């Protein structure tokens, strides 16, 4: 396919048009009075959202050069979302401001490489200063404030704060769609995995269709159990103790399953069998987690252990186990707290090393199950459209809160960026490098200016006053008042603000140093369908 090439000014101008189209669509959502954007969906109702990255990902422009510019800025939003989980609109606004300002100077004859150096220098100073003014997040109230600001909803803030309090900072908090109108929190304490009973004859509560075992022993193995002879010795020992038994195995079938069911129905003893969770190496790791949590051992031939040789000492224990058709929950495992802590640290180390998003998610889940539990926020709304929009907002709020716990908080509403203004302005630089610093200075005013504009105010007036106010004092666009932002609960996670600035600068520097752009030449459609050969054309 033939290619079309554009050079220097022409190339950058074409890409800038794409940058502006995307950024203008995204930036209207910024601030407490930000507007929504409606996205067409090929199937189902349209999606209404104010989430920057969701909007950016939807935009495809017809002109290939404009589209490349748009995609570059979409990359800023996407990268910020990956790192911090929020702040995508701020990142887009910063990137657009740096690109526009930089392009003016490049057009006027400045050297793009000098500008790039200046931008990098300024951003490094700004990031250091942001870290210096960052405050650690303390208590449930601070967490609720961060979440409420991100979701623009105080009720959501309280829910997330409660969820984090219940399952700890390492706990897993997931979002599900609720059947009703209300948004509520459901916490599963203990370890839960997605495997249910092998046979419905094992249930103890026919009304709830679940098997509840009080103070049971837990047999953990990675083998398939089909012969009753294999587990007979351990069954006899458990029966003597007069306590129920949970069997976690690759599978329980045939004669072994029939014997367990018959004895359960006769009331001789109570045993429930479930399949082991996960697959392959992940299954081995999860079985080991369960063993450590319950104080038992994994009986595996790989470790030279046979089921026949299992004793009561090899079994795990818990205060309660609830098994439904789909899930098994182990509450209060009797494992040694030191071993559990060591296992948690081991998983944390793996988390830091992994590069796979899927592995990270699975390790995070395992960590949560060992550390305390899983919280589920069930999102409710009146219509499907509102539900999708609300779910996206809560997801952002959740990411924002995690980022705040990790790196602390700074004043929100663009105030923190204005607070680092003087430090960046004090950088000593000359020539084009100084121009790069000025570009960053102009860009860090932009979020405040945009927040003021969406609130129907003159942005420049707010920006100029902010430069003279003492640090931490900012403009609350929701009420139109000047307040101490942190005291008023208007805060941003440091990680979100830092990532937005770094990613915007990175893409702006790449954009300004672009000298040629290559795109596919659109094929001309000659029109009309060609007839099939020897058939006199199409009918």
UniProtKB/Swiss-Prot annotation:
CDD domains: GroEL. The keyword Repressor does not apply. Its main location: cytoplasm. GO terms for molecular function: ATP binding; ATP-dependent protein folding chaperone; isomerase activity; unfolded protein binding. The keyword Nucleotide-binding applies. It comes from the Bacteria. Pfam families: Cpn60_TCP1. ATP binds at residues 29-32, 86-90, 413, 476-478, 492. Induction: By heat shock. GO terms for biological process: protein refolding. It is found in: Cytoplasm. It catalyses: ATP + H2O + a folded polypeptide = ADP + phosphate + an unfolded polypeptide. GO terms for cellular component: cytoplasm. Keywords: ATP-binding, Chaperone, Cytoplasm, Isomerase, Nucleotide-binding, Stress response. Together with its co-chaperonin GroES, plays an essential role in assisting protein folding. The GroEL-GroES system forms a nano-cage that allows encapsulation of the non-native substrate proteins and provides a physical environment optimized to promote and accelerate protein folding. NCBIfam families: GroEL, PRK00013.1, PRK12849.1, PRK12850.1, PRK12851.1. Belongs to the chaperonin (HSP60) family. This is Chaperonin GroEL. The gene is groEL.
